[in-house]
Amino acid sequence: MVRVFITGSSDGLGRMAAQLLVEQGHGVVLHARNERRGQEALAAVPGAETVVIGDLMSIAQTRGVADQVNRLGLFDAVIHNAGAGYREPRCIATEDGLPHVFAVNTLAPYILTALIQRPKRLIYLSSGLHRSGDASLKDLAWENRPWQGQQAYSDSKLHDVLIAFAVARRWPDVLSNALEPGWVATKTGGPGAPDDLDAAHRTQVWLAVSDAPAATVTVTGWTHIYCWTAMCGLKSCGRLAKPMIGV
């Protein structure tokens, strides 16, 4: 049995991944941003161990999520599934004065990666839109640029890939991977999304628990079990990760 913590698992792909992991006999801890959603998540995934509560828009609450997770003991895998902010028409500021999309998609997985006891595997959900992300890493918090919602989302998804690469460089004993779930019919993707929803959550589950040779590698991009090539290429992503995380 593998023990897995999944952020953003109260609905969507995170909940689907949790349900599949429980069906396979693994231990799962859920995450939701508030108590109401947490209870809904437990009802939807009754085999889960428990649910951790905290809004990833908030730095303080994100740190609180890490504290709650650490009190539950070691995990074999952490899936950074939570995401938000696709095409936000205006910049929504958090209590910390940061853009909502940056706080949830970039800063939260960074903080959780730094604070949660190191698992054997780390999985980061990116997007095909990472290819349009700004690789300069300038103005991460959109303090100087006019707001562009889709660009902000693309930037954040490139950041997720870079975090995965930076972790792989710093922690060679951890399997660190990023994946693209495809354009699927979730709240973010919309009802007209063309890709296979039933396949979208399976890649993160596979990366979390499989002993297949292809799943036990690091700094690789995946979508629906098929390898994809990052916009900047593997060597370039590794280079770009250095200024972002200092490794």
Question: Where are the regions a protein language model picked out?
Answer:
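Canonical Rossmann dinucleotide-binding motif of NAD(H)/NADP(H)-dependent dehydrogenases/reductases
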Residues: 1-29
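Conserved glycine-rich Rossmann-like NAD(P)H-binding loop of the short-chain dehydrogenase/reductase
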Residues: 24-40
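Rossmann-fold cofactor-recognition segment
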Residues: 45-60
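A glycine-rich helix->loop->beta "capping" turn
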Residues: 46-47, 68-80, 86-92
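Conserved Rossmann-fold cofactor-binding substructure of NAD(P)-dependent oxidoreductases
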Residues: 56-74
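C-terminal helical subdomain
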Residues: 62, 178, 193-240, 246
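Catalytic loop of short-chain dehydrogenase/reductase
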Residues: 83-88, 99, 121-173, 180-193
